[in-house]
């Protein structure tokens, strides 16, 4: 039987630079969706990914849904 509380959850990663820059030409910041294991990484996930708005590799932070 499957457990009611899954260990893998879907999270949203948002660009740190785009979310802080309110005066940018792009109305929304760049976002990625991915999964993480709740048991192995209980803290918020931080990854370095490519941002299409900034045109460079930036830090992406996990955000609340």
UniProtKB/Swiss-Prot annotation:
PROSITE patterns: RIBOSOMAL_L33. Gene3D superfamilies: Ribosomal protein L33. Its main location: plastid. One of its GO terms (biological process) is translation. GO terms for cellular component: chloroplast; ribonucleoprotein complex; ribosome. GO terms for molecular function: structural constituent of ribosome. Keywords: Chloroplast, Plastid, Ribonucleoprotein, Ribosomal protein. It is found in: Plastid, Chloroplast. HAMAP family: Ribosomal_bL33 (MF_00294). Belongs to the bacterial ribosomal protein bL33 family. PANTHER family: 50S RIBOSOMAL PROTEIN L33, CHLOROPLASTIC, LARGE RIBOSOMAL SUBUNIT PROTEIN BL33C. NCBIfam families: PRK00504.1, PRK00595.1, rpmG_bact. This is Large ribosomal subunit protein bL33c. The lineage of its organism: Eukaryota, Viridiplantae, Streptophyta, Charophyceae, Charales.
């Amino acid at each position: 039987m499957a457990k009611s509380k899954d260990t893998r959850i879907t999270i949203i990663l948002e660009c740190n630079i785009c979310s802080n820059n309110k005066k940018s030409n792009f109305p929304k910041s760049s976002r990625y969706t991915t999964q993480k294991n709740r048991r192995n990484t209980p803290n918020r996930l931080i990854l370095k990914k490519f941002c299409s708005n900034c045109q460079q590799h930036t830090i992406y932070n996990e955000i609340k849904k």
